Amino acid sequence: MSKDKYDEQTVKFYDKNFLKYINWSKKNTSFKLEKKFLSLLDETTSIIDVGCGAGHSSVWFSKKVQKVTALDPSIKMTDKIKFLPNINTITASILSVEFHEIFSGAWASFSLQHLEKKDQKKAQRIIYDSLKPHGLFYLGIHKGEHSYRDNLGRLYVPRIKEELESELVEIGFRIWDISIKKSLSFEKKPIEIMHIFCLKN
């Protein structure tokens, strides 16, 4: 993996299977977490959706806040929403962009787990720098100890709660809430997932 890109095999999967993934994710989106996220924001001026994927969250947020920046390395994903109002799409990895205190919130729903650990930490720092003071960061990620490729070729680097919590605090975040839930993957396999809400100090 190059220093500024997601795993190429993973991106190719989403480019090739974007319609199937969009349909699956639509059926599995309730917007409960998005509503919680919005309720915790100090202000609702601008949000960045890191690894926006199918764009369901970006579209939902775009109706609630002034501006959404939807970021994803898959051009097939960003093409689906690039002409919608209040959404600015960027086809790139979080590792290749730089923002300074312009977003009130950052939303990364199961996207950073496609990065190696060291790149996850780099992405978290980029997100931290992109947030205004007291900005809110949501991170959804699979819980686990070992990285792997699934049967579809996607790279997964799940994390242990304590290790990830320590990493976020080291960067400068204050943890507001962490919950662990059981779920099913795109392949319908049982998984554990973490929902993490933290604030920029």
Predicted feature residues:
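Short catalytic micro-motifs in class I SAM-dependent methyltransferases
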Residues: F110-S111
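Helix-to-beta-strand junctions that scaffold the AdoMet/dcAdoMet cofactor pocket
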Residues: L115-E116, L131-P133
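Class I (Rossmann-like) S-adenosyl-L-methionine-dependent methyltransferase catalytic domain
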Residues: M1-E98, K118-K122, I126, L136-N201
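A conserved beta-strand element that flanks and buttresses the S-adenosyl-L-methionine
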Residues: W107
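Conserved acidic residues
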Residues: S104
